C-alpha cells in the first residue's frame, strides 16, 4: 500500500523485495503517530535506510493508513474538548470525561472503554507542549525517577493507551471463558495464555474459545493460534 506495489512482487529475487524492510520498520514505529525519531529508535538506520529517506516513509505510511491517522486526531480532539468544556465526548465507542473526587480533591481525565473499564489521567491540565501546541498534561510516576512528575500526551500516545487497554480486555474475556471450562491458567504473557490442561483438551478447542465473539465488541474479528508443549517456550 505504501509503495503501490502488489504484495506478491515483494518476494526474494525481485527488486521490489528491498521495500519489505522499509514497510516492516514503518509498521512497527509509526502506528501511534511516531515520526522520523521513532523510525530511528526502532533501528531504521541500522537496517540500511538512509536518514533522508525517513520523512518520505512517514508520509507514505500515513497516506496508506488514513483511518489510523484520523483516529489519532479524533482521540486528541475529543480529549482537548473534554478538558476545555468539562463536557463528555463520545467517539468510536469511547467516552471521554473530566471527573473529580470531591472527598480527596482529585481530578481525572478518564476514557471509558467499550468494556466499561476506564483509563485515568490524574490531575490533568492544558498547556503548550515543547512544539508550541496546546496539549494535555497530567501527573504520572516517572519510569526513571519513580516519583510523581508531569507528562504531556497527544493523540497517537492516547490511542496506544486505548488500543492496548482494549486488547487487554479482550484477553480478560478469554481468561474468564477458560476458567468457566474448569481449566487452569498458569500465567499469561502479553497476548499469550499458558494453560495446564488434560491431554484430552486440544489446541483447536482453546483457539475456538479465543475466537468467540465478545458482547461489548460486536463485529470484532478474533483469532487464536497455539501449540502444545511440556514447558513454556516461544513458538
Identify the role of each PLM range.
Residues 1-235:
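Conserved catalytic core of nucleotide polymerization and phosphodiester-bond processing enzymes
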Amino acid at each position: 500500500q505504501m509503495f503501490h506495489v502488489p504484495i506478491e512482487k515483494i518476494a526474494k529475487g525481485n527488486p521490489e523485495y528491498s521495500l519489505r524492510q522499509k514497510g516492516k520498520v514503518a509498521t512497527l514505529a509509526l502506528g501511534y503517530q511516531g515520526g522520523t525519531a521513532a523510525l530511528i529508535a526502532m533501528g531504521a538506520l541500522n537496517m540500511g535506510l538512509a536518514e533522508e529517506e525517513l520523512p518520505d516513509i512517514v508520509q507514505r505510511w500515513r497516506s496508506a493508513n488514513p483511518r489510523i491517522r484520523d483516529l489519532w486526531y479524533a482521540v486528541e480532539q475529543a480529549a482537548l474538548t473534554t478538558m476545555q468544556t468539562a463536557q463528555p465526548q463520545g467517539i468510536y465507542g469511547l467516552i471521554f470525561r473530566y471527573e473529580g473526587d470531591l472527598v480527596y480533591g482529585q481530578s481525572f481525565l478518564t476514557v471509558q472503554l467499550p468494556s466499561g473499564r476506564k483509563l485515568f489521567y490524574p490531575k490533568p491540565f492544558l498547556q503548550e507542549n515543547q512544539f508550541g501546541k496546546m496539549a494535555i498534561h497530567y501527573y504520572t510516576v516517572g519510569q526513571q525517577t519513580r516519583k510523581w512528575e508531569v507528562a504531556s500526551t497527544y493523540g497517537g500516545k492516547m490511542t496506544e493507551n486505548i488500543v492496548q487497554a482494549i486488547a487487554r480486555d479482550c484477553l480478560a474475556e478469554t481468561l474468564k471463558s477458560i476458567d468457566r471450562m474448569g481449566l487452569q491458567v498458569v500465567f499469561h504473557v502479553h497476548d499469550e495464555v499458558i494453560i495446564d490442561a488434560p491431554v484430552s483438551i486440544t489446541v483447536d478447542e482453546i483457539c475456538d474459545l479465543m475466537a468467540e465473539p465478545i458482547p461489548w465488541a460486536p463485529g470484532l474479528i478474533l483469532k487464536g493460534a497455539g501449540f502444545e508443549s511440556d514447558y513454556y517456550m516461544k513458538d
